[in-house]
């Protein structure tokens, strides 16, 4: 079934109409309490079969969901988005029934629907708090991350993300996840092996939220992957694999890259969060394979995919958050080049300069106000828009400028000559860069101009004439 069926008509005849006119309605809806009781009773019967009917044949039968029952429980799934229905389900202790299904039923579709209903109910604060503070419920839901059914995993992650987004109970879930060791392994397994883009995006959002909420948990997950050195053999072939968080994040990012920009944004943000702690940076750069894999993926994104020369400048509005994360991680890796000789990143300096300057050029274009106010009605008024106060655009500019200044400081005479020859550097591009870098990064600009002078004295003079503050100190 491709989608959840719509709820049925609330009445089937005159008698039903009379019932709904009385006390059978759920809140202000047209849904019937009696009908809902019947569906929930059917659920109870599914997970508590009569004695004497157990056996392999019965288990196989339980693994399949009758079409009529599936239709009815799917209607409940749709209905549970209504607050009155959700509160009624809570009052009737439906979460206990759904938890019983999750604990006992082998039917993947039924498990998916039950978690989905709980996810809808958790969108309402009172219900979310009730579900979250029940330790038994919490353990059952975390155990669902062991499920092999992608739709069930997707709904489980959606439910967890909903709960983690509620400030009143977020800490409860963080503590519970830290105490539940299988969560890390299950999440890493999904990221490293799943090809389901929707699932990868949602599990990425859960990891992103967890790392944002609790740095200690992030550090624990980073260190879990360091329990076995790269290339260390398994002494016991039956031993469970030890996952490292960075390769798992990279694999998931590669899967979602071409299909879901928002999902890629999530995984780049996870990498950026990892670089906010030294252990996270080391987890990326210490292992040659991981460091170089990370660099290659991110370098390819910014140099060959995002903000390309033939893209309209306004594309920056769509890509600003993912670009900020990518440049931030690349900058952290680049800063480790002296200590990590195995990182093969020097050849990327000139293409990165080209990409960074293009981002700054596009940013300048987006921030320009039309000379003729009437033009704003005809030339992309809402796409570009005023971005001076755009928080994310400012973050991108700050990160880009810091990264560019760092690259300028390590450029050799040979690299500058190559850049001038190949076009990554020019008077126009350098001027654009200086406008963004000065005055904050004055020393880096001064050092760069000194190197330029060794290669092209005329260009250095032109740049100093255009930017007197640089000339005064060189």
Swiss-Prot record:
Tissue expression per record: Expressed in the synovial tissue of knee joints.
One BP annotation, GO: positive regulation of synoviocyte proliferation
Region feature (Disordered): 1-24
SUPFAM superfamilies to which the protein is assigned, alphabetical: ARM repeat (SSF48371)
Keyword Nucleus in record: yes
Cellular location(s): Nucleus
Positions carrying Phosphothreonine: 387
Keywords: Nucleus, Phosphoprotein
InterPro entries the record matches: ARM-like, ARM-type_fold, Synovial_Prolif_Regulator
Biased composition annotated in UniProt, kind: Pro residues: 1-11
Stated family: Belongs to the SAAL1 family.
PANTHER family listed in its UniProt record: PROTEIN SAAL1, SERUM AMYLOID A
Protein name per UniProt: Protein SAAL1
Recorded name of the encoding gene: Saal1
